Amino acid sequence: ELELTESELSTTYPKYQDGWDVTAYPDGTLVNHADGSKHKYLFWDAKNCRTRFDFSKGFCVAGSDTESFLKDKLSYMGLTEQEMNEFIVYWLPLMEHNAYNLITFQSDAYTNSAKLDITPTPDSLCRIFMAYVPLEEAVEIEPQQLEGFERKGCHKLL
């Protein structure tokens, strides 16, 4: 179950109907009980977001360097090639043509405003939420310290 405390759901896939009812398998496959469809992840997007994201630490990246930056950081955070590819395919068109991007990977601001209730609890859970602001000029910012993700037993990437 997903509980948004500072926004409303706008798009979900598969359809979110009072929660997702899926079975997770050790290879990461999710089977949706509503229609039997198989998924690698559950997608949601929000509107009317009132969360105040933390931009006190992060990275100022030239738009032309966004792809290599994301590959490096996402790999460090434990994503597989396929997971990185899907993340980059979604975000790169929005970011690479900006002069610069101020990029942060949110933790508490994200997990506190988008709470998950997963039953049974997975052995490991990776939640990556990137926030960015397009910039015309580079800015100095304290680099953000990122954490890696170790996959153990039944794991989920959200």
Residue spans for each PLM region:
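Protease-labile, long low-complexity intrinsically disordered regions enriched in Pro/Ser/Thr
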Residues: E1-L158
